[in-house]
Amino acid sequence: MKALSKLKAEEGIWMTDVPVPELGHNDLLIKIRKTAICGTDVHIYNWDEWSQKTIPVPMVVGHEYVGEVVGIGQEVKGFKIGDRVSGEGHITCGHCRNCRGGRTHLCRNTIGVGVNRPGCFAEYLVIPAFNAFKIPDNISDDLAAIFDPFGNAVHTALSFDLVGEDVLVSGAGPIGIMAAAVAKHVGARNVVITDVNEYRLELARKMGITRAVNVAKENLNDVMAELGMTEGFDVGLEMSGAPPAFRTMLDTMNHGGRIAMLGIPPSDMSIDWTKVIFKGLFIKGIYGREMFETWYKMAALIQSGLDLSPIITHRFSIDDFQKGFDAMRSGQSGKVILSWD
């Protein structure tokens, strides 16, 4: 079958032929319809330090997808041939304390699809049936293909009660923009997103965010005054991994504020811890999605009117995958969809 693989320990991703994966007793075989390029895939393409330490070569990459069930393992219940599915990209062990306690998103033995085992940038994918999620009929293939990153956004945004709250989102990448849109959709008062990438800030404006702020040109305190905010942000969603952005968030949080962190800062990032302590801030780390509570919330948010369509900016045939990666690497894109049909 046709697949996109990391074939060499250098920059790039290559089209290749690989065997169709074998179906296990507890697995589904999925014929891929559409995939989306994740920032993780760009890291793998660039062959950065993280990728060099993490990705075995060769490896079929990709973990954002929608497809159709074409094979069912003999022990699988609850699925039928033709079901349209996406899937949780974190394969968990099932036997650690967190898995047995129902906190599977915190499994210490997690394996990543397209990272530690063959991924979805291929004509066919095999995953455990436990990881598959049926897509409702009224959700498009394009939106289903981005459920994985949308899940990161939903998990982060819904970590805290947002109704009537003032929310700061630092980092206007696709996940940050979707998190901001979720916050607005569920009843936050003011949702402010910050970045220095004007293209992506404009995408955020199309999603109905209260204010998209280019911090290279505007002062966040001035924006807060303009919005009538006198006490700081109640909730912070840190999506950038940029130390200056996180420090600004700490400066502008209200006392007792709550912060969810999805962005990955450098290991040597320094902050003024007195602001965390004396403001009584709560900081929560976010990894992946809650299985599968986040997935049900994702579907319900879209079905209740949340419009994510502006975040998808580019669509290509899989044969033009290089154009898709070029768009993602340029920083002048939202989500990029690759069609396998």
From Swiss-Prot:
It catalyses: L-threonine + NAD(+) = (2S)-2-amino-3-oxobutanoate + NADH + H(+). The record marks D148 as: Important for catalytic activity for the proton relay mechanism but does not participate directly in the coordination of zinc atom. Is totally inhibited by EDTA in vitro. SUPFAM superfamilies: GroES-like, NAD(P)-binding Rossmann-fold domains. Zn(2+) 1 binds at C38, H63, E64. Gene3D superfamilies: Medium-chain alcohol dehydrogenases, catalytic domain, NAD(P)-binding Rossmann-like Domain. Signal peptide: none annotated. Keywords: Cobalt, Cytoplasm, Metal-binding, NAD, Oxidoreductase, Zinc. It is found in: Cytoplasm. HAMAP family: Thr_dehydrog (MF_00627). Homotetramer. This is L-threonine 3-dehydrogenase. The gene is tdh.
